[in-house]
Amino acid sequence: RKNIVQFAKISCVCHENLVQCIHNIPIGVNKSGVEFLLPWFMWQNGGRYMDVYKYEKIRNVAILGHGGCGKTTLVEAMAYVTGVVNRQGRVEDGNTISDYDKEEAKRLFSISTTLVPVIWEDTKINVLDTPGYFDFVGEVEEALDAADAAVIVVSGKSGVEVGTMKAWEACEKRKLPRMFFVTDMDDDNASFRKVVEDLTELYGKKIAPFHSPIRENEKFVGFVNVIKMAGRRFTKLSDYVEGEIPEY
């Protein structure tokens, strides 16, 4: 059912208690295993209380893609930009909020689907960080059954992989709205153009870039908003200013 995530993990801690979400109602589980409802259906996250949102202001978005393409890193960046965390973790360091399980931190990849709630403007987005390796495909299927839309992550360095196509097929099966997000654009070997060409070859006119990267001296310095035909230059990790669109 839409807007309902059943038995999905939430990567936040409330007084050292693991918080889970069942039928969209926050439930705490203390060390003795006793369940308790959090007051007013709110939970504490980093000292802040997250408000209750009506269903029309809630979106469940699944993050899909091949193993190692950057899904968890993207989710971590979303949490940082929206203020859920004040420090961005790294998969390599085993300190991301979605891969909090000891086994995940040890293996450096996701084993189960994790729910990371973020707030963007007046909408609550339940981001579902799914595993990329086929051994855990059941976790992906469950996330997609609860999702309103999906983001398929593709590495600009590795390009389109088997997991990319599997993710598309899973979305097609459910007629789920989807978009692609290209990662690793700060890598010298990344090629946004090659990714777009390969996706277009596979899926035809369904592929339409909304943004195009700006590179100078082999560095990723900004992007072009294709819809608005406006250039953007990065100033900090999550900030940018308007700039000229390169002639190339």
Question: Which residues make up each language-model segment?
Answer:
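P-loop NTPase catalytic nucleotide-binding module
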Residues: 47-69, 88, 155-248
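P-loop NTPase switch module centered on the Walker A-proximal segment
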Residues: 46-154, 158-160, 209
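Tryptophan (W) side chains
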Residues: 40-43
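Cysteine-centered motifs
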Residues: 12-14, 21
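Residue-identity detector for glycine
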Residues: 28, 33, 46-47
